UniProtKB/Swiss-Prot annotation:
Keywords, comma-separated and alphabetical: Acetylation, Cytoplasm
Positions of modified residues (N-acetylserine): 2
Record-annotated membrane-spanning stretches: none
Acetylation among keywords: yes
Family statement drawn from the similarity comment of this UniProt entry: Belongs to the MDM20/NAA25 family.
Role description: Non-catalytic subunit of the NatB N-terminal acetyltransferase, which catalyzes acetylation of the amino-terminal methionine residues of all proteins beginning with Met-Asp or Met-Glu and of some proteins beginning with Met-Asn or Met-Met. NatB acetylates TPM1 protein and regulates tropomyocin-actin interactions. MDM20 is required for mitochondrial inheritance during budding and together with TPM1, is essential for the integrity and assembly of actin cables. Genetically interacts with CIN8.
UniProt cross-references to InterPro entries, sorted A to Z: NAA25_NatB_aux_su
Name of the molecule in the record: N-terminal acetyltransferase B complex subunit MDM20
Gene Ontology cellular-component terms listed: cytoplasm; NatB complex
Amino acid sequence: MSDKIQEEILGLVSRSNFKQCYAKLGQLQKQFPNALYFKILETYVKFKQSPGKFDYNKLLEEPYGLKGTTITGDTRSLEFLHNFFVELGKYDEALHVYERGNFKFPSYELSYHWFMKALEDSNYNQMSKASLQLAKYSDSGNLPKRAYYFWNAISILAVSRFQENTLSDPKKILLSRLARQSLLDLKPFQNVQEIIVYCLVLDELFPQSREISEEIVAITFANFDTSVNLYLKNFILKHTKLLNSPQKLFEVCSKLIEKGLDDYELITNLIDAAYKLSKSKDEVKQWIDENLGDSRNTRLARLKLDIMYTDSVSESSLSYYLSKYHNKPCCSIDLNHYSGHINIDMLKSIMSKYDPEDKDLIHHCNILELGLIGSDSINNYNKFKGTLEKKSVTDYSSCSTFLLEIVKDKCKKTNPELKDVLLCITILENYQAKDPHNFDTMCWLIVLYMYLGLVPDAYFHFINLKIKNVQTDSLDYMIFSRFSTLFPNKQSDFYSKTFHEHNNLYDTSLANLPRYIQVAFERNSYSKILGMLEMRDKLMKSYTRWTKTLENLQFSRLCNDKRGHLLQKLHEDWRSLEMTQSVSFSDNRDFSILDENFAQFLNRGKILEYANLNEESIFLTLIRELIIEALPNGEKTEQISALLKKLPSINLEELLNNNLTEVESASFLIFFEIYENNGKNLHDLISRLMKVPINAKQNWMVSHTYLTKMATLKTLDSLKRIKDKEIQKLIKNSLKELRSCCDDVFKGYSKALVQAYEELKKDECGNLLKELDVKAENVKNIKNSLLGIQKSVRNL
């Protein structure tokens, strides 16, 4: 019944039908005079009716706040109060109502609600308190009393790992001792999960010491008599090494290996310990072979043995490894790790024995990556391109390595020439037809097209990557960075389908993770919980998530769409971030798929400049959108003031120039000027915006500069706060001027692309294409793609 009533009341509020709201609530309060729930609902209605006039202290803080006099144990009232306080940004008060309710009306149900609400809010300090309360009701719950002490320990671990800034040193020491002692009182531990939690407490909450290491080694070593657990393996190995006892290290490693763990870290530590114990090399080698047999790890162990005993890899050990792995992708990775101990001439000699005619593609890639031959990308590609016809369609070939060497070399330059970018596209498009599932070349094609601002072409390859789930968070940067000023087409699948589908990852995952964590607590799957909390933290703070949210707000301004629901969602997400008590962003983007040394492609003027976003640029963009939201009211907000204080304390213009493009900086200053100084210097700043050249760089900056100007001017044009007739006229004239040059801007860019294509047939580029037997792509395809973007832009 209460859910239906709440839904009805909130529905009336959303329609601003306050008269009917009060009538309904008055009727309910007559019917249920002692029901606090309806009084709280009425208070909320008063707030929604007049937020500016709402007397927070009298109506909410005094009765229900930290020192409030009205305390309830009714869970529906507590939940509504909690949500009310959260909406107001009063996060301590939001959970304090549960704490006070438990103090006056103690019960298992109330404590459980408190714990789960704290979990939803990412408030691990409150989870710690609630879990101890739960332990008082061992007969009321579904779990034995001991379980809640493990819940408490995990909560304290979460505070220490994710919210250490909330702990003073004395409090951290107190909580650590409490967690340890409460678990010690539960000995003997009943399963591996309980042992893992206890080891985590010792490992993460206490300073490193011999006593701690001895205790962890003792408790984990005893457990390996019955089972092998990788969490415990990591604990015992780490702390056995800290004990600095070769005998104990050898004992531990040998026992785990005898249990069937073919783990290279264990093997290398076994070898280290054996050497210090003066065991012979042959004895150790024989022991490893007898217990593990033949595997990649045991073959690599021969190299480690040589290095430990003679400081150099022997010919026999190297031959033993290479006889099986010379033509496997792992070969160069493994051997480069030991390159300082391998004689280069010996390595060349042995490698040549296994492929004397140099016909094996992966073997050849390995000798190239091992530095045994010089790079000759063109000849290497031509030598092995015949293998493309023999491979399975769904496999992808290492031939791409040779072509990507050429591409990366061209793209290292600052402000690469159009003809070089088109050359790279031509080479890779030709290759992609022969190796359609090659992930590496598809990623580079996306980046190259995005550098040119040709989003439809980039999108074609992006959807062929078929990325799913968490991959979207790490790879969406390739195509959705600054998308609002690159491809403003609401009807395209790019926006209407893929953008929204990929965004669902955040909403769905963040909504479901608390439930999954709850289940893990209840099923005693303790080892999974901290990992899930970390995943939630990373998704909540994701660079990609926040940049897409802010880009979508700018996109809605550009398209004259209503932004109410987007702003509401922004504030909800921001409150969730604030509740973590660590307002920062997490860079989960994976640039290594493009190159190990990816930083060389990210700087200003580089091929990945469009995706070069950081924490400062996200904060600046967030501040810009919040300022635009606040401008109609003409009032400064605490939220914006707090965010401005988070920025580095340097000159604002310098900060903007370091983190945004020139046109983004000019746009920011316009809105900031209205917010701070009521537009005193607005005329000069608009003139400055219009002077930013659109065609200074013939690449993605053409669309980006034009559309950033357009979004800025359209937003200014819709602001009723601007009363100055001269400024109004300047805005409208600037919009007219911008729209009038649209076709010329894109025709000029199209002409530059055509001219660059013509240059592909000449000189060095033409010779390279001939050597690779590649024909230049039809320029018509790129012209049509640019024309599609031009039409979308012209309609704004």
